[in-house]
């Protein structure tokens, strides 16, 4: 396996863990969570927004020339061979109903081909990093 992308993987793992701590703080106080409907059975909470901000800040700090596409804020205007994809709280509906089946997902593509990904399940403290070998 080619470990060329290990620094990016470490950055994504660390960003997901930081965001996960924030998400779990919100999960511990769901009764006061601010939630907005984006459509039928499609919600965004302040936990989604805070998680996305934490992740995008971490990725921008380490890789300022990479494009970022995130679920809540869309894409930045950077033209790059590398593009991060972020779902800051995959399973928002479960999350807001207190169902502990949600995760943070971060992926990185090079020339539109996936090269690494991280799924972090904060509730169970499980983080699954992957480097794709093509």
Name each model-derived stretch.
Residues 104-108, 118-119, 126:
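Short beta-strand scaffold segments in enzyme catalytic cores
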Residues 1-89:
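N-terminal subdomain of lithium-sensitive/metallo-dependent phosphomonoesterases centered on the IMPase/IPPase/PAP
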Residues 96:
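Glycine-rich, Arg-bearing micro-motifs that act as flexible, cationic patches
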Residues 113:
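Active-site neighborhood of HAD-like aspartate-dependent phosphohydrolases
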């Amino acid at each position: 396996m080619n470990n060329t992308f290990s620094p990016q993987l470490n950055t994504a793992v660390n960003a997901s863990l930081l965001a996960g701590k924030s998400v779990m703080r919100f999960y511990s106080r769901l009764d006061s969570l601010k939630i907005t409907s984006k459509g039928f059975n499609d919600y965004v909470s302040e936990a989604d927004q805070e998680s996305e901000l934490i992740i995008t800040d971490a990725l921008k700090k380490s890789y300022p020339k990479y494009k970022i596409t995130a679920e809540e804020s869309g894409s930045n205007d950077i033209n790059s061979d590398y593009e991060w994809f972020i779902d800051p709280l995959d399973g928002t509906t479960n999350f807001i109903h207190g169902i502990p089946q949600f995760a943070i997902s971060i992926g990185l593509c090079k020339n539109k081909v996936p090269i690494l990904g991280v799924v972090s399940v904060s509730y169970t403290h499980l983080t699954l990093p992957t480097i794709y070998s093509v």
